[in-house]
Amino acid sequence: PFDTRGAVPRLPQQPYHMVSRVLSVTGPAGKQEAGLTAIAEYDVPPDAWYFEDGATGCMPFSVLTEVILQPCGWLASYSGFALSGETRFRNLDGSGKTARQVRPGDGLIRTTTTLTRCARVGPRTIVFVALEATLADGTPVVSLQTSFGFFTKAALASQAGLKSTDEARAFHDAPADPPDESETCLPVSARRLDLFDVIDRFEPTGGETGMGRIRARQAVDPYAWYFKAHFF
């Protein structure tokens, strides 16, 4: 039995579990080769919490990414890349296109995920996948090429993170200069998707491209719902 060969990463739990079913897989469990494909579906509840909390009436992008990336994690675990039970799973990068918003009446999202290649460097494994997400009638939603890494706890502890710049550090340390409330007209997310406490600095022409830069802050609640829901 597959579960006797080691511990593998599991999918997030509610309210961030975004796989309703896996319809098919083209190969047996533990097979690590390019071309392995899985088809998964997520039933979109018309009254889902994120439609209300997101304030736009559409599925928030943070939720959509879970819908399309969780099948990637499932396929990587199914393929046996983490059977040692000693590795952590991280999404690394991606390049894709979003074709449309997902709305309450759309029914379901079907994601076809294909393992394209993998690479091992010491205890690290990098897995590359391509996916297409559509509605039940085939209407395109997202196409994406992305990669994931399996890392040891020691490797994650020594990671350097994103390289900062003097300009970024100066912006981080700059005094508060919040926008005038009369200048803000867009609705903000609420409840579970209310993920900042305050916007304390706004530069309309800031940033590398001159198109604006904003600084938000949130006091991290160790009991926040997303810690338990998303792997932890």
Predicted stretch roles:
Residues 1-59, 78, 82, 103, ...:
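Non-catalytic linker/capping segments at the edges of enzyme domains
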Residues 61-65, 69-77:
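Active-site- and interface-proximal helix/loop "cap" or "latch" segments in soluble metabolic
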Residues 1-4, 72-116, 143, 149:
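Hydrophobic beta-strand-centered segment that forms part of the acyl-chain substrate-binding groove
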Residues 46, 68-69, 98-99:
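A short, hydrophobic secondary-structure junction motif
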